[in-house]
Amino acid sequence: MEAAERKNELRKRTKEFAGSIIRFYMALDKKREELRVIGKQLIRSGTSVAANYREASRARSSDEFTAKIDLCSQEADESQLWLELLREECGISSEMIDPIWSEADQLIRIFVTMSKNTKRNHD
């Protein structure tokens, strides 16, 4: 797969991740205050992954690219935290959470590798 294809594939994948977060939030019972509050935090972090990846795609320098990719990783990690809290403290089923958590984990691994490779090639 060429670099442009990988870039477009990851762009699509991060957008799909954001969409899965939105659909997950829409399925929550917003009458429960804790679900509404944590769900909104999850929406912010989960959609931020896609937004920051798009910004990274348009970076003007290696340093800017690395900074945005690192933000993607951080936001995906934060999304995992909110998902864990929803499962462990709010009783949301693993069946609902695990696929999204796993995708966040895979994205984190990709972003960490991208960041390391960019830093190595830049030094």
Predicted regions mapped to residue ranges:
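Amphipathic alpha-helical assembly/interaction segments
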Residues: 1-123
